[in-house]
Amino acid sequence: MNSLFASTARGLEELLKIELEKLGAVGCQVVQGGVHFQGDTRLIYQSLMWSRLASRIILPMGECKVYSDLDLYFGVQAINWTEIFNPGATFAVHFSGLNDTIRNSQYGAMKVKDAIVDAFTRKNLPRPNVDRESPDLRINVWLNKETASIALDLSGDGLHLRGYRDRTGLAPIKETLAAAIVMRSGWQPGTPLLDPMCGSGTLLIEAAMWATDRAPGLHRGHWGFSGWAQHDEAIWQEVKAEAQTRARKGLAEYSSHFYGSDSDARVIERARSNARRAGIGELITFEVKDVAQLSNPLPKGPYGTVISNPPYGERLDSDPALIALHSLLGRTMKNQFGGWNLSLFSASPDLLGSLQLRADKQFKAKNGPLDCVQKNYHIAETTADSKPATVAEDYANRLRKNLKKLEKWARQEGIECYRLYDADLPEYNVAVDRYGDWAVIQEYAPPKTVDAQKARQRLFDIIAATLSVLGIPPNKLVLKTRERQKGKNQYQKMSEKGEFLEVSEYNARLWVNLTDYLDTGLFLDHRIARRMLGEMSKGKDFLNLFSYTGSASVHAGLGGARNTTTVDMSRTYLEWAERNLRLNGLSGRAHRLIQADCLGWLREANEQFDLIFIDPPTFSNSKRMEESFDVQRDHVALMKDLKRLLRKGGTIMFSNNKRGFRMDLEGLAELGLTAQEITQKTLSPDFARNRQIHNCWLIRAA
């Protein structure tokens, strides 16, 4: 009997143990990453040929203590390699692990190689050659602290390489993991199996090979035992012949069918080629179509299983499309696949929540470095009076109601950008803004006391409901997370897409960027204030301080201002403002753009203006500013500087976003200024619920 080890992906060890025992293995012991077992020579070949789950079959050769590189050298040389190698066999060494002595795996591999070669030369035997690409023997050495374990890898290449897959195409899951997913799915061979996002067809091919009793090793052309002196070719040929006989019989007797589809025609062609090479091409129908076109291929029965490894995203901006995909799949399953089972393998359990289905079973496994989950669902049979479930129904109803009211109003006003929803319902704490045929969802970051997974699931529900109510494609929905603003956070860059969208606001055309920054370049709540500035600007000299992207300057220019001066500290936003002005035919000396610290520029300027708009930050202590600024504390001093630039009979429009802001009327009076609050006049219907979104004042000389 040989002591052997079968390695596998994390999470599949128990499944592998059952498989090995069915093959005849004894003494099976599960450890992390594999199973120790015992078996004769025939079992070695049986496990190599028939294991669908093992990554490699390893034959341990010995262990040694390693306190120096000489310990490793002599420990390896103590093994009788001349009884392991066939004459003329090539080899390669794979070394993993480090300790205080062996600090480089390449150095460790070199010492092992030297020890093996010297074992031959000392006996005056021809030295074996190294072949790193396709060796006859693979020697594996694992160094754990001071212990080196030396073994012969009888697999050669990993057992997931069945021989049917085109190696030029990347596979998101290995064949061994795919086989485990099929086994855990609850699917019964002989019943239909469908993968609506099949990619190169790995899940379906593994299922078909299992169902037709086709050994996973039948199509492999190279093994790790070809140069092994104890290899028994006669037994191997018996095992191989048996596998071929069973495969022919299994294919001839199998009567059910497999169905695969994908939106990418290239991967579907690759899937067809893979299935043909695997010998089961006639059993699988592959089609080019996306999930939106998914339909039950057997509406009158029998019931089957839908299985898939759907895509997942690592970035938040990919979520809308993926959430829509999962939501659509869930609805399609309920509408067309009543009585069927569904099994999905995913690295994103939260996305599976978008199915709006309750899982009966779930399993955990590793896909490379990724923690993954497989969830199995049974789809209830539908009845004539069954009503489809609505995702986030309260939120969807409110959004639908707001849309009906605001869409008509916006069209009459001549605006394309407006707020549709602003945390109307406390449990759905987001803002939804419309920008033409785009939508932006801003999630207000939940407090730390809220369960993060529940909050993420609710956000996914919001995205699915928003896409459904607005009827927009997922690629026109942008998702952002907004935290309480401090200093100039709103100006920090989030992305590098550089994609601008032209929108209309009354008679102005403006550029917005929905992805690269937390804000889009257009403060929607100031829309009416900008229109008022346009109406007040005719024939006047206009100053715009803390100008952001210059949209107020655009309205002033279109309103007939004699000239506009736009001041901001950010070169990025000044360039954006220049683009906005040019878009409206406003350019030349009459429309100046100045990059400067606004407070410093204000103290040094000696020009006069008829109309000044200033919308300062609530608080700022930027390194590029000479001093900190607090709008509550410093607004009177600010007005003192502004008054110096204000022409007789002129007006200052002063706005800020500080909640609970209190205007110091007495302080203004001492400066000879009066203030008229116009906040309510500047609030439009889409911000009617949030009357503290900003406050706005007209300030004039007394």
UniProtKB/Swiss-Prot annotation:
Keywords: Cytoplasm, Methyltransferase, RNA-binding, rRNA processing, S-adenosyl-L-methionine, Transferase
GO molecular function, one term: rRNA (guanine-N7-)-methyltransferase activity
Subcellular locations according to the entry: Cytoplasm
Sequence similarity: Belongs to the methyltransferase superfamily. RlmKL family.
Protein name: Ribosomal RNA large subunit methyltransferase K/L
Gene name tied to this protein: rlmL
Record's GO cellular component terms: cytoplasm
Domain THUMP, first and last residues per copy: 43-154
Protein task: Specifically methylates the guanine in position 2445 (m2G2445) and the guanine in position 2069 (m7G2069) of 23S rRNA.
Predominant localisation class: cytoplasm
Catalytic activity: guanosine(2445) in 23S rRNA + S-adenosyl-L-methionine = N(2)-methylguanosine(2445) in 23S rRNA + S-adenosyl-L-homocysteine + H(+); guanosine(2069) in 23S rRNA + S-adenosyl-L-methionine = N(2)-methylguanosine(2069) in 23S rRNA + S-adenosyl-L-homocysteine + H(+)
EC number: 2.1.1.173, 2.1.1.264
